[in-house]
Regions:
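M16 family metallopeptidases and their MPP-like homologs
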Residues: 1-63, 84-88, 96-97, 150-185, ...
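Peptidyl-prolyl cis-trans isomerase
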Residues: 241-250, 295-300
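Proteolytic maturation boundary segments
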Residues: 29, 53-165, 313-353
Length: 353
């Protein structure tokens, strides 16, 4: 309630409102890239009898929201006059029987079609011209002796996506998966604490996600191209000098150990472990994974080192945006540290037994 009162009093920074509005607009742009999401929007508009014009003007409505609007809504709907509902888990009475409702179920007429079904079938269907992805649009640029950039123009909006794929994963660095998870809450040594870096990225309306699999380390950034240079600079500094958090590492260890305790009783996980052993033998993920002792002894210094070493491997950079691929343009690949001058990609090599 204290936080709600602060919102009602306007005790927040203006940039946070701007960041939230920009994020919502970016998410709407991404939804409009997806045929599935657009179909869901049309479906919701249809059965809620919404005006499509209002939906298409969503971004204008979001950007028109002011600080006074937020304070007004908080005071009106988030006041002390509220109803709290608490739910507790109980034990049902095994002998109790649920009574049948006191009304008869609606039985549709057999062999007849409802008025709604008739109207729906008679709705006009327009003709659509399919636009398939053209792989010929992908342009390839050599970054160094081993690393390349794959560029695809974004013809839909001004949202960019930058994916840096380093050619080394958990097979080469078994602890890299934990290091990647910590990178999602990391700062920059000597510059930003984790929360401060998140705020800086929010101001730029950019998001960054790090993950790893057996063969690669992935760094994925999305945002609007207007702030692409600044976002790439922060990303580059974070990769080169990550400041991993000890508290996050402690939580990660606890979560990993807790999940291992639970999976012993999970039939689906046991089934998957058996399947992997039948396919891969001693190379099964469940056999290769870190031991409990190794997880308990994880250190920030070694995880930071794994990120540094993995980012020195051969890389592929995938960029989708509106920036033209010309020598006169400063490209996003000039910001993230691209290794590969000395270390080639580690090819997948797990085979079935």
């Amino acid at each position: 309630m204290k936080a709600i009162q602060q919102i009602a009093n306007g005790e927040f920074e203006d940039w946070k409102i701007d960041a939230i509005k920009a994020e919502k607009c970016r998410q709407f742009d991404l939804e409009m890239e997806s045929n599935e999401d657009k179909a869901m929007i049309l479906m919701n508009a249809f059965y809620n009898e919404q005006d499509l014009g209002d939906i298409l003007n969503y971004k204008d409505k979001i950007m028109a929201i002011t600080t006074d609007d937020i304070k007004r809504v908080a005071k009106k709907y988030l006041s002390d006059n509220y109803l709290a509902l608490y739910i507790e888990k109980g034990k049902p009475d095994k002998n109790a029987k649920i009574e049948k409702p006191g009304y008869k179920p609606v039985e549709p007429p057999i062999g007849k079609e409802s008025l709604y079904a008739t109207q729906f079938k008679n709705l006009p269907i327009g003709q659509m011209e399919e636009k398939f992805a053209g792989y010929g649009e992908v342009q390839i640029k050599q970054l160094n002796d081993r690393s390349k950039m794959y560029y695809t123009p974004n013809k839909e909006n001004n949202v960019f996506q930058l994916v840096v794929q380093y050619g080394a994963g958990e097979r080469e660095f078994p602890k890299l998966g934990y290091a990647a998870q910590l990178m999602n809450n990391a700062g920059i040594m000597g510059a930003y604490e984790p929360q401060e870096l998140k705020e800086e990225l929010s101001k730029l309306n950019a998001t960054c996600h790090v993950t790893a699999d057996d063969d690669n380390l992935y760094i994925i950034m999305e945002g609007y191209e207007a702030t692409l240079p600044q976002a790439c600079q922060l990303l580059s500094r974070q990769i080169l000098m990550p400041k991993l958090d000890e508290k996050q590492l402690a939580r990660l260890k606890g979560s990993a150990m807790g999940m291992r305790q639970q999976r012993k009783d999970n039939v689906s996980i046991l089934n998957e472990a058996l399947r992997q052993y039948m396919l891969y033998g001693e190379k099964s993920d469940y056999i290769k994974e870190l031991t409990d002792k190794e997880i308990y002894e994880l250190q920030i210094s070694e995880l930071t080192g794994d990120i540094n070493r993995a980012s020195n491997y051969e890389a592929k950079v995938f960029f989708t945006g509106t920036l033209p691929l010309r020598p006169s343009i400063r490209y996003p690949e000039q910001e993230p540290p691209i290794g590969g001058q000395r270390t080639p990609v580690q090819l997948p090599h797990r085979q079935r037994t």
